Regions:
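Bacterial Sec-dependent N-terminal signal peptides
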Residues: 4-41
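An acidic-aromatic substrate-binding cleft motif
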Residues: 119-174
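Active-site-adjacent "subsite" loops/lids of carbohydrate-active enzymes
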Residues: 128-148, 219-288
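Aromatic- and acidic-residue-enriched carbohydrate-binding clefts of CAZyme catalytic domains
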Residues: 172-203, 231-268, 299-316
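Active-site neighborhood of glycoside hydrolase catalytic domains
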Residues: 268-356, 361-375, 381-384
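Aromatic/acidic polysaccharide-binding cleft in carbohydrate-active enzymes
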Residues: 297, 382-471, 515
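Carbohydrate-binding surface patches
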Residues: 482-545
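C-terminal beta-strand-rich structural cap/linker in extracellular carbohydrate-active enzymes
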Residues: 569-580
Length: 580
């Protein structure tokens, strides 16, 4: 793996220190010397039939080739739940009864000397509600090329990455009239905002096939958009917002001449507009089996006015809009974009959105900004709502392939901090706010790596994004000849940065490899982030409080995320161990 040693997760379970307070622990001694060696020969590709499962549901596994003597093992974190011999290319497992839990299934064999050889892995998310651990993807093209078999193939890839919710971008007819046709008569084909063909059957097939994989389907639309023909469809002049007080200059989002229309902006707090668009959404739900509404906005517009000349407080109107949408369709899910964090606290404060969604730009371009957003969202959402970043990678790279080191470093940081990344589409990865843009491709190596990273995020979700308290740790490399600079968050160039959290009596330490980083921005604008310098056999000393019972490590960059127990010694208030 080109990216090895970039993202480690080491956890020290303290059997007498559940709170993390400790008592100094200077006198604790001990350690573990007898651990099973682990290596890997990743020749077995595994799939499951769904992206997530309810407790007690049957999980169906398929493997492309299983060598004789292989076993399948199911673990949550580092604990083996069950194990079985496998024969044949498919088998089933009953998801355990505990809700909201991540598992890693691995196929392995044991060598004569006792070494375990990992042959392949796959994560399993047992969660009755997808919004507890959202892994968001997208679809954005619905033309004649999207046959049922093509859609099945695309969604199979998203399923392999455990994508449990899919945003439908640029699927609609008009922002103020999203359905192609009427409630009583759908158009077989209609044009989207860019005058692309949209096949209603393709939209329906995407939804149906996503549902077969256990995914949820969310339709995208602005909260306040209308096209230039909106008056003919019943949209009133009094509903718009204006750049001045004289209601003559409508606020607009300008688009290319070849597109249908510019988008003119309405007052999201106007009760008549809310009733109008809620009824349009009702027409959508009556015909298309969407699970909810991904609400969009356009960030800070500056001073804007309603028809009567009153200044409009947009974040306040978002609250009113969200409440109106939930009131009309209480059983449907809502998510709203906080563009550059605009309106984030108000959106979260409604208590009506299922997770938080931040589209991040140049004003939030650094890794430290991601941390700041997650911390703020944690407060805004009363510690209950997860965060998804819409973060467009390699934004200024004109063509070719995505830069794998940049993608994986950003994902590593987001996942370590407890977020997730909207980036995976059925047929391409996201490089632009215009979701149909396919100017950059994923290499086969990146596709493989992304599967490993999403397995990792899913299998270890209970350590990554399920509560806990952040803490600073003292971690040093005890071999000066390695010439390694270890620092605690925030990241530094030419360093390995640790980020630590205490979760359910375990100390979780992430090691993020910035040794070769040319920037501390997540954007990797031109796709120039270098591959990180690989570090192996790194002897480490970690200060700890309380007695440590086990040290284990996992990374998406080695053994396909399978965990490995490490030998360690504890004395003088610290443990020493070697990171493989």
């Amino acid at each position: 793996y080109a990216m090895a040693a970039m993202f480690f997760l080491a956890s020290c379970s303290k059997d007498n220190d559940e709170t993390g307070g400790g008592n100094g622990g200077g006198g604790e001694t001990g350690g573990v010397t007898d651990v099973t060696p682990v290596t890997s020969d990743l020749t077995v590709n595994l799939t499951t039939d769904k992206a997530c499962y309810k407790p007690g549901e049957t999980v169906s596994f398929t493997a492309d080739a299983l060598p004789a003597g292989a076993k399948i093992r199911y673990r949550t974190l580092n604990k083996v739940i069950s194990e079985q011999a496998v024969a044949g290319s498919s088998w089933t497992w009953t998801a355990p009864a505990t809700d909201f839990t991540g598992y890693l299934a691995d196929v392995y064999r044991t060598k004569e000397d006792g070494t375990e050889v990992i042959l392949g892995t796959i994560a399993v998310d047992v969660s009755s509600d997808w919004t507890r651990f959202p892994r968001y993807g997208f679809v954005a093209t619905f033309d004649a090329s999207k046959t049922e078999s093509k859609i099945q193939e695309e969604m199979a890839f998203l399923n392999r990455c455990h994508i449990n919710g899919v945003q439908f971008q640029d699927w609609h007819n008009k922002h103020h009239w999203p359905l192609g046709g009427t409630r009583e008569h759908l158009d077989a084909v209609y044009k989207d905002i860019a005058n692309r063909d949209i096949y209603t059957q393709s939209v329906k097939d995407y939804i149906r096939i996503q549902h077969s994989f256990g995914m949820k389907a969310m339709f995208y639309n602005l909260c306040f958009g209308a096209l230039d023909d909106a008056a003919g469809d019943g949209v009133k002049e009094e509903w718009y917002i204006f750049k001045g007080t004289g209601h003559t200059d409508k606020d607009a989002h300008t688009l290319p001449d070849s597109w249908k229309s510019n988008i003119y902006l309405l007052d999201p707090g106007n009760a008549e507009w809310q009733a109008y668009i809620a009824q349009c959404n009702d027409d959508v739900y009556a015909n298309l089996d969407f699970d909810g509404y991904q609400i969009d906005q356009l960030g800070n517009r500056g001073d804007r006015y309603d028809y009567k000349g009153n200044k409009v407080n947009l974040p306040k109107t978002y609250v009113s809009f969200i409440e109106a949408m939930k009131g009309k369709h209480p059983d449907k899910r809502l998510v709203m974009n906080a563009v550059s964090s605009y309106g984030a606290s108000q959106i979260a404060g409604t208590g009506k959105v299922d997770f938080l969604y931040n589209e991040v730009w140049g004003d939030e371009a650094d890794f430290t900004d991601l941390y700041t957003i997650l911390k703020a969202n944690h407060q805004y959402g009363n510690q209950a709502l997860k965060t998804v970043f819409a973060a467009y990678m390699n934004y200024e790279k004109g063509s070719g392939e995505f830069n794998m080191p940049g993608i994986l470093l950003t994902d590593a940081v987001m996942f370590a901090l407890g977020g997730s990344h909207l980036e995976l589409g059925g047929d391409h990865m996201l490089c632009s706010e215009y979701f149909p843009n396919t100017r950059l491709q994923m290499s086969d190596a990146l596709k493989t790596a992304v599967v490993r990273y999403y397995d990792f995020m899913t299998a270890y979700q209970n350590l990554l994004r399920d509560g806990g308290e952040e803490e600073k740790v003292t971690l040093v490399c005890t071999d000066a000849s390695k010439n390694l600079n270890l620092n605690t968050w925030p990241p530094q160039k030419s360093a390995i940065t640790s980020f630590a959290r205490r979760v359910n009596g375990k100390q979780v330490v992430h090691l993020l490899n910035f040794l070769s980083a040319n920037s501390l921005s997540w954007r990797d604008l031109n796709g120039t982030m270098p591959e990180p310098r690989l570090v192996t056999k790194m002897p480490l000393k970690l200060n700890v409080a309380g007695k440590v019972s086990k040290v284990w490590v996992a990374t998406p960059d080695a053994h396909a995320g399978a965990s490995q127990e490490l030998a360690f010694e504890q004395k003088d208030g610290a443990i020493t161990f070697t990171l493989p």
